[in-house]
């Protein structure tokens, strides 16, 4: 039996993907049956981080070592991730949500529709306020764009109003939000988005 929703979480290295997955697990685990697949190039660092953080029981977390280019494992040949998801769905037949966190990649990374139903794309303010206008599938076509680390804006000279204007121009009506996952600012919008996507929500 498959889970009700498979959610991809993608974005550049250090943008806050694992922090978002952890926050979603902690917020949703008491009301939903959850599991996570993480992707790293040569390690299982993100899976180990989630386990140490107590985000979920260890058996609900699978770490995939992609080798080479991380985008290949979520797009062109996602068989290793599909197998990990299928394994979790076999072990936990009542899963509501499986999150698949990609390895850190560039703005062109996107998930295969064979792997996930929806994608959240995470960027961070520390990379500069020009990132939204650079475009790419994650910026323009993700189901939800999360602009993380807003607390760093004054430290890196990023203008959040510029980021907001560029994001609205690049995304049109597609949803997006600002977050600071260190203190939970904006997390409620991400949680509400996820809950709204579940069947029979």
UniProtKB/Swiss-Prot annotation:
Function: Facilitates the functional incorporation of the urease nickel metallocenter. This process requires GTP hydrolysis, probably effectuated by UreG.
Recorded GO CC terms: cytoplasm
GO molecular function annotations of the record: GTP binding; GTPase activity; nickel cation binding
Subunit structure and binding partners: Homodimer. UreD, UreF and UreG form a complex that acts as a GTP-hydrolysis-dependent molecular chaperone, activating the urease apoprotein by helping to assemble the nickel containing metallocenter of UreC. The UreE protein probably delivers the nickel.
Family of this protein: Belongs to the SIMIBI class G3E GTPase family. UreG subfamily.
Keyword Cytoplasm in record: yes
Cell compartment(s), UniProt: Cytoplasm
Domain of life: Bacteria
Record organism: Parasynechococcus marenigrum (strain WH8102)
Protein keywords: Chaperone, Cytoplasm, GTP-binding, Nickel insertion, Nucleotide-binding
Protein name, entry field: Urease accessory protein UreG
Primary residence: cytoplasm
PANTHER family reported for this sequence: UREASE ACCESSORY PROTEIN G (PTHR31715:SF0)
A single BP term in Gene Ontology: urea catabolic process
Residues that, per the record, bind GTP: 11-18
